[in-house]
Amino acid sequence: MANIYYDEDASLDYLKDKTVAIIGYGSQGHAHALNLRDSGIKVIIGLLAGSRSIEKAKAEGFEVYSPDEAAKKADVIMILTPDTVQPALYQSAILPNLDEGNALAFAHGFNIHFGQIVPPSYVDVFLVAPKGPGHLVRWMYEEGKGVPGLFAVYQDFTGKAREIAMAYAKGIGATRAGLIETTFKEETETDLFGEQAVLCGGATALIKAGFETLIEAGYQPEVAYFECLHELKLIVDLIYQYGISGMRYSISDTARYGDVTRGKRVYEAVKPLYKKILEEIQEGEFAKEWILENVANRPHFNALVKKDEEHPVEKVGKELRKMMPWLGGRGL
């Protein structure tokens, strides 16, 4: 079982008299910065020239610097830019400004685990990853609560990297809910697997396969959309709040019987595929593919996204969502 830590297990003293630079001011960066500051920690922001977030960060009372200036001024540098941006940003702006005993921090382990960022031996390296979007991390903090999180230490130069990581997690509110200790390897590989096999790739593939099956059998696209996509939220919300067994308690006996008998067939079909997907992640095959795709300016990726955007489920959904006033007409 996992080791889980709470407020009493962590001390903010390890960040006392230190400056934390948050590189990036998006969803997570915004939440981390505000929560850390409200926890009494000195925070500065590092943003590239021309960033749309500069004025927002300044309006919220932060000193804003270029990433290299922020890294130079900070003791702890948390990099919260997209994974694909981090390696070049690190090489140009952060690495040249790292001092002995600094701490380099991440919210996802991809670039460290797959060797896209190789930190010098004279710094601490840790990870703190709240298991929720930035707005929730901030909202829960303001309510005196927190969002559970993960933390890991990759490199402990000072002998205090673990304590500093836990202090950071406490500063953003994670220890109020529960902080789970992990490794960069575990966080990275499980995060990628969840995205590919279940949360994004798996869910969207099931939706499209179900939708297409009904259409090909002669059913109306609108009805297929409701049954295979729209109602998914109802079930996921129940699972999210009550777990799988709790969800089953809330559905009809007919639905429950179909779940436990027919769902097993899907399980048996996808389990071997899941093992293959995980193997590709563990062996670095996916990381290599994604890195090379970005080097080539994403031709395959862009083509696949465009193709999926033209899927009939998108056209049908766009029209049906106009019938749902509770969505407020919001689009992307």
Swiss-Prot record:
Pfam families per the UniProt record, alphabetical: KARI_C (PF01450), KARI_N (PF07991)
Source species, domain of life: Bacteria
Entry binding sites for substrate: 252
Catalytic residues identified in the record: 108
Cited SUPFAM superfamilies: 6-phosphogluconate dehydrogenase C-terminal domain-like, NAD(P)-binding Rossmann-fold domains
Cofactor: record remark: Binds 2 magnesium ions per subunit.
EC numbers on record: 1.1.1.86
Positions with a binding annotation for Mg(2+) 2: 191, 227, 231
Record-annotated KARI C-terminal knotted domain positions: 183-327
Record-linked PROSITE patterns: KARI_C, KARI_N
Pathway: Amino-acid biosynthesis; L-isoleucine biosynthesis; L-isoleucine from 2-oxobutanoate: step 2/4; Amino-acid biosynthesis; L-valine biosynthesis; L-valine from pyruvate: step 2/4
Residues the entry annotates as binding NADP(+): 25-28, 51, 53, 83-86, 134
Catalysed reactions, semicolon-separated: (2R)-2,3-dihydroxy-3-methylbutanoate + NADP(+) = (2S)-2-acetolactate + NADPH + H(+); (2R,3R)-2,3-dihydroxy-3-methylpentanoate + NADP(+) = (S)-2-ethyl-2-hydroxy-3-oxobutanoate + NADPH + H(+)
Any one GO CC term of the record: cytosol
Record GO biological process: isoleucine biosynthetic process; L-valine biosynthetic process
Binding site for Mg(2+) 1: 191, 195
Keyword Oxidoreductase among UniProt keywords: yes
Cofactor requirement: Mg(2+)
Occurrences of domain KARI N-terminal Rossmann (ranges): 2-182
Key words of the record: Amino-acid biosynthesis, Branched-chain amino acid biosynthesis, Magnesium, Metal-binding, NADP, Oxidoreductase
A single MF term (Gene Ontology): magnesium ion binding
Family: Belongs to the ketol-acid reductoisomerase family.
Biological role: Involved in the biosynthesis of branched-chain amino acids (BCAA). Catalyzes an alkyl-migration followed by a ketol-acid reduction of (S)-2-acetolactate (S2AL) to yield (R)-2,3-dihydroxy-isovalerate. In the isomerase reaction, S2AL is rearranged via a Mg-dependent methyl migration to produce 3-hydroxy-3-methyl-2-ketobutyrate (HMKB). In the reductase reaction, this 2-ketoacid undergoes a metal-dependent reduction by NADPH to yield (R)-2,3-dihydroxy-isovalerate.
The protein's name: Ketol-acid reductoisomerase (NADP(+))
Native organism taxonomy: Bacteria, Pseudomonadati, Aquificota, Aquificia, Aquificales
